[in-house]
Structures are given as structure tokens and as C-alpha cells.
Amino acid sequence: MSKLIQLDRRSFLKSASLTAVGGSLASVTNIGSAAEMGQGGIKNGKFNFDEIYDRDGTGNVKWDSQYARFGAENIDVGMGIADMDFRGSPAIKEALEKRIKHNNWGYELLQESYIESIVQWNSERHGLTVDPATIKISSGVHTPLIAALNAVCKPGTKVLLNTPTYNGFYGDLHWSRTEINDSEMYKDDDGVYHIDWDDFEARMTPDTYAFILCNPQNPTGNMWSEEDLMKMGELCLKKGVVVLADEIHCDFVMKGQKYVPFASLPDKAIVDNSVTMKAISKTFSLASMKSAYYFSTNSALLDRVNYMHRADINSLGIVANEAAYRHGVDWFDQLLPYIDENHNFAEAYIKEKLPLVKYKKAQGTYLAWLDVSAVGEAIDAEKNASDKGMKSDTHYLEQWFVDNAKIQLNPGVGYGTGGNGHMRMNLGTPRPLIKKAIDNLADALSNV
């Protein structure tokens, strides 16, 4: 095994610097010392997202659960689950510290100021006006989505999804006792996904009651245009299919792209046929704070969902989320271009170092959807998966990447029809770690 791969993550965290990438690629900044960084990971008055912030031992899923699965010595870079590895916004920490000083944790009322902060964020960042009276708070996007599915679908009926799509939706279908109805998208020659409109409409059979829209699309990174969303909405309205819009990644819009909220569409009837679910948990990496919300312009539809929904508030989650909405904008405004450059760097560096891997820069999210079908062919992933009793070629690829490159990526098969031959890589991490992951993989594939 190469010296590169033998350098484990803990040694890497202690390293003083990494070599900058030459040529036209984005540079990888040296890892600053604590003294250089200053308090809270701030360097020269700016948030330093190149800082390698050690999350080990906090019980986090992205790193610690992978150590439990594969052994800590076998993971240099965890790039699976969709949360970020950066220090959070100082505003969130300050608000939590202030609340914790009050040492009582009884039942709490939801404050109007929190709803107001949600309305303000949507208005100022996305030009979307949301009636505060229609906003309902939940513990995460899954909870209202399951409630909505139970509200509009009979057990055993179908739910339409454009695939590849977020793997968590399939669990939501299980808990709502509904059936999968995948409409596979297609890739053009540039690697961009598009909806197969003929198939999309054909799958709107009388027993299909709902369509789960992922906007932007996880894992492919599509930022859906108004034209696309209108066509989806028109077909759903025509066929009696309710649109359930998961827009949790909506703040991560890459340069030159645009996020169009489904609720902003110009046709009232189309918008009234929908429920939107959102959270700021991706934006500020607050997944464990368990706070989200949903809304609809259709009061009757909203009442049906509310009837099926139950979620109490998390007091610290509300504090953290409101602090993010009101005081975290500077942090996020610095983070967003950093994520955009991570995508640029990954696309260029993969092209340079990994001829067997294809990646087209995502239009949104901090996720990279990698075409690793050529790698699968080179290592005979399908046969090896079958011989070892694994679920799919991409499950074998996940294990192979850990064994040979010490990186963990999510298997593509979990993202529905069309996921085979792909892996999802999380780019919400310091650029030096992205470089290390690609270098490790390049070294491993040099022997194939």
C-alpha cells in the first residue's frame, strides 16, 4: 500500500500544510495553526473554511459511525452523509450559550419571532412571500413528509419520484405504507440530468396520489427551472397528483444558477396543489437540532396534513435556528462561494487525476454525483458483489474505496432507479480533505 494511503486521518489533522494544486485548478490553502486561525476559526477577519475541524468522538454519523463500521484506521475521509465539517456560525454558539445559562428546561411556547425569522429569510434570500399563519413547525423534513403522504395517499397507492433521488424518501414511503413509482431521469452527453417527460406522465396512473419533488435535486444537483416546475405542476394537477416539495438544500445555489421555489410559481392552482417542506439544517449544518417547517397556500390541504402531524419543538433547536436566520448570514455568505469553488476544484481535479470517474459540476447542493461505472467494470464490481452476497455493485464499490483508498462514499443504488454505477460524494468539507480523497483514490486506481 502506498505511503499516501498509510497516512491516517489523525496524522493528517496534525499536518502543518498541504501542497497547493498547480495549474488552473483552485489552490488548496495551507492548514492554519490555532494561533493563525484565531478564535472560532476566523483568519484575517474571514471565516477559514480550509480549517480541518476535528469532529471525532462527538458521536456524529459522518465520521464516527464510519469508524464503527470500517475501523477508524481505515477511514481517512468520510464523505457520505449530507452534513458539513466546518465550524458553525459563531452567532449560533453565542445564542446557545446564552440560553444554556438559564438552567430550566420545561415546556416552552413557540415564539412569534422564530416564525418571523423564517418569513424574513425566504423573502430576502429567495423573493418568496410566505404567510406566517400557514407555517407549521416540525422536527425535521421527514416528519411532515410522512404526515403529508398519510394525508393524501391511501395505503398501497403509489408515490412518484424522479430518480436518482434522495434515498431517505424510500423510508418515508415505508412509514406511510405507500409504494415506489420511480421515473428515471436521463443524462445528456455533458452529464446533466433531465426529466423523461413521457415516462413521468405515463407513471401518473390512477393509483399514484403524490409526487415528491426534490428541489434542488439530491443527489444529481439539478436546480429546476420555472419551466420544468410548471410542467411538473401542470401534469400533477391534470392527473390529480399532489406535489410534496422537499426544498431543504435550496440555499446552496451555485454561481450562475437560480433556485425557483415551487410555491413561487405564477399559477395559483398549481401552487395550491402542493405542500412545501423546508429547513435551515443543511444551510448551517444543524441536523441534530431537529427543527424544520412546512406550509401550503391550500388551507384544506394544510389541515389534512396537520391532522396527521405531531412534533413538539426542541427548545435549543429553535434558539439555534433563529440565531442562524437572524445573525448567520455573514457566515453563510462566505461559505457559499467556498462550496462553489469546492465543486469547481473537484470537477477539475477528478478530470485530471481520475480518468475512470466522471463528474459534472452540480448546479446546487454541496453534493457530487460521481459516475464510477468504469471503475466498477475495472474491478468487476458486479460479479464481486454477487459472490460476496452484497446488495449491489455500488455496495462493493463502497467497500473497495474504503479498503483501497480509505474514503467512504454513499452507494448510488440507494438513490433509486439509475443509481447503479454511481456514488455520492459530500463536498461540504475543507478543500484539503477533498484533495486528499481524490489523491487517495487516484493512488488506489493506479494499480487497477
Across the structure, where does each feature detected by a protein language model lie?
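Conserved glycine-rich beta-strand-loop-beta hairpin in the small C-terminal domain of fold type I
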Residues: 339-347, 359-375, 381-384, 419
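PLP-dependent aminotransferase-like
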Residues: 45, 150-213
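N-terminal secretory signal peptides and thylakoid transit peptides that target proteins
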Residues: 1-21
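PLP-dependent aminotransferase class I/II
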Residues: 273-352, 357-364
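Active-site phosphate-binding strand-loop segment of PLP-dependent enzymes
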Residues: 187-257
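N-terminal small-domain helix-loop-helix segment of the aminotransferase-like
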Residues: 41-140, 147, 326-327, 447-448
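PLP-dependent enzyme catalytic core of the Aspartate aminotransferase-like
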Residues: 383, 390-396, 400-448
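Helix C-cap/helix->beta junction micro-motif
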Residues: 176, 238-239, 405
